[in-house]
Design a protein with these regions (language model features):
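Local cysteine-cluster metal-coordination motifs and their immediate loop/turn environment
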Residues: 112, 190-191, 212-242, 270-276
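Ferredoxin-reductase
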Residues: 1-78
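A generic structural signal for residues embedded in beta-strands
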Residues: 36, 84-85, 227
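FNR/FR-type flavoprotein reductase catalytic core
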Residues: 71-216
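Short, Lys/Arg- and Gly-enriched loop/turn segments at beta-strand edges
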Residues: 42-51, 89-99, 237
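Structural signal for conserved beta-strand scaffold positions within catalytic alpha/beta enzyme cores
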Residues: 6, 51, 154-156, 209, ...
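Short Fe-S-cluster ligation motifs
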Residues: 235-239, 243-280
Length: 280
């Protein structure tokens, strides 16, 4: 049984679950993901591992409640169990030998960026963290980032917390001022990662992006997570999720990401109706 040992609401729409999964915790590395099903009839949800404790045998996942599957997952309480919890899947983020790295996260993507920043910090890498949110109420994991970053910058769209603006502004400034990053690692909305790459490419700063497209089985069989990288078809679940940002076709990825929106909306509405019936 994959029991929820701890539950934490990070903001009104983002939840962290700490799940007892000793075999996964034993092998997990930063950048890898799991696939979870809340209940037997739930959809399979790929989520990048947000943290793990090998001694306690626990794995943390962080998700935003956006559809029927995440609504069902969010309905589970401490001491209850998820139906399936499979992993670790995908390739770990390659960080060996890096001396100076900028980690750029956006929104709930910061949950994926955090374990990478922590792993970099643990190996002695200088870490500059830049994270962006729409407003103060949506800021997550600030204390955790500050603990592992040599420099940490928070950006909000409306200026209600940290600095006003988007993550590319301080990133550009750091590069122009001669930060000499070995690599920029960015995780967040596709449009954000696209513009991070547009910022770094003219300066020839290697940029790694974490791609999280539609995914079903997590083993390369369904082909749902296919991407075009360097003119070739790649599968995020087995070839990634990390890719060279200079090579990713972001426009195609964004188009594919909208293909199932009507179905997702229908499923969410149906789940809301079921929850209303349970309350009544």
């Amino acid at each position: 049984m994959f029991t929820i040992v701890k539950r934490r609401e990070l903001n009104p729409t983002v939840t962290e679950l700490c799940i007892h999964a000793p075999l996964i915790a034993k092998k997990a590395k930063a950048g890898q993901f799991i696939i979870v099903r809340a209940k037997e009839d739930s959809e399979r949800i790929p989520l990048t591992i947000a943290g793990f404790d090998r001694e306690a045998g626990t794995v943390s996942i962080i998700f935003q409640v956006v559809g029927a599957g995440t609504m069902q997952l969010n309905s589970l309480k401490e001491d209850e169990a998820v139906h399936d919890f499979v992993g670790p899947l995908g390739k770990a983020t390659e960080i060996e030998g890096l001396k100076n790295v900028c980690v750029v996260g956006g929104g709930v993507g910061c949950a994926i960026a955090l374990p990478i920043a922590q792993a970099l910090h643990e190996q002695g890498t200088k870490v500059t963290g830049i994270v962006g949110f729409r407003n103060k109420d949506l800021v997550i994991l600030e204390d955790e980032f500050r603990a592992c970053c040599d420099e940490f910058i928070i950006m909000t769209d409306d200026g209600s917390y940290g600095e006003k603006g988007v993550v590319t502004a301080p990133l550009e400034q750091k590069i122009v001022e001669g930060a000499n990053f070995d690599e920029v690692i960015t995780i967040g909305p596709l449009i954000m990662m696209k513009f991070v790459v547009k910022t770094t490419k003219p300066h020839n700063v290697k940029t790694v992006v974490s791609m999280n497209p539609i995914m079903v089985d997590g083993t390369g069989m369904c082909g749902g997570c296919r991407l075009t990288v360097g003119g070739q078809t790649k599968f995020a679940c087995v070839d990634g999720p990390d890719f060279d940002g200079f090579e990713v076709d972001f426009d195609e990825a964004m188009h594919r990401g909208t293909m199932y929106k009507p179905f997702e909306a229908h499923a969410r509405e149906a789940e809301c109706n079921l929850l209303k019936q349970e309350v009544q």
